[in-house]
Amino acid sequence: MKDLYPFTSHAMELDSYKYHFIDEGQGETLLMLHGNPTWSFYYRNLVLGLKQSYRCVAPDHMGMGKSDKPQNYNYTLSQHIDNLEALVDKLSLSDITLLVHDWGGAIGMGFAVRHPQKIKRLVLFNTAAFLSKKIPVRLKLCRVPGFGDIAIRGFNAFALAAVGMACKNKERMTDEVRAGYLAPYNNYANRIGTLRFVQDIPMSSDALSYSVVKNIEENLEQFKSLPVMIAWGAKDFVFNDHFLKKWQGIFPEAKVHRVQDAGHYVVEDAYERIIPWVQEFLQKNPL
């Protein structure tokens, strides 16, 4: 996997647990936030394509990737935002361009709402940072007590389904790439973060993270004046065009690339197109 992910590992300690991140290149900061069930591996091609001109920082959320996977941990959106806040503080990051995917949207925009002065540009990949009732049946099943634990932790169903379905250009999901995505989630204990993310989706007002997401949603409009780019996989069975239209309503001036032949893992499907799009976007919107 070193050939696919040729980066130096860094870690900071958070409450005695290891919080892993990569920090490649120099220049303006690009902070790349993954979702579930991926890890910083998802951004490897973007990092390789952009680190010559930019500083690319990509953490693994606690319970994911190369970060520790404690079994008794507060795996909530608020905690993930706290962890990101600690990393940004440790690295003294400012003038940040946020690149977010999946759960990375809620985590990243949650951080942005807390520290709007630190955020200068936004790049969105098939994500949400607002409340929605739209959730596929298979995701609902994974939230059923008992069943979700057996399916996600026992059989690794969530991560296996993702490598099978989230990338539409099947030639991209080689044995090596597939192994890279699955490597951190190789046993029951190491799948704790994957399950907790699914359980933390706020589907009702009494959900733990409901008020957190509601607050983020209510504060998104303050970023309307920022440059925003959206690259959206049109064949995503979770974050479909309903979510894209919601983002366009919030950020009507956003530069949108709807990638017709890409799925949920839009960066995996279309990184050769996305890298020059990001480069052009950054150059046209200087700090």
Roles of regions detected by a PLM:
Residues 262-271, 275:
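Catalytic histidine-centered segment of alpha/beta-hydrolase-like enzymes
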Residues 15-23:
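A short loop-to-beta-strand scaffold at the N-terminal edge of the catalytic core in hydrolase folds
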Residues 2-11, 19, 42, 57, ...:
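Flexible "cap/lid" subdomain of the alpha/beta-hydrolase fold that forms the substrate-access gate
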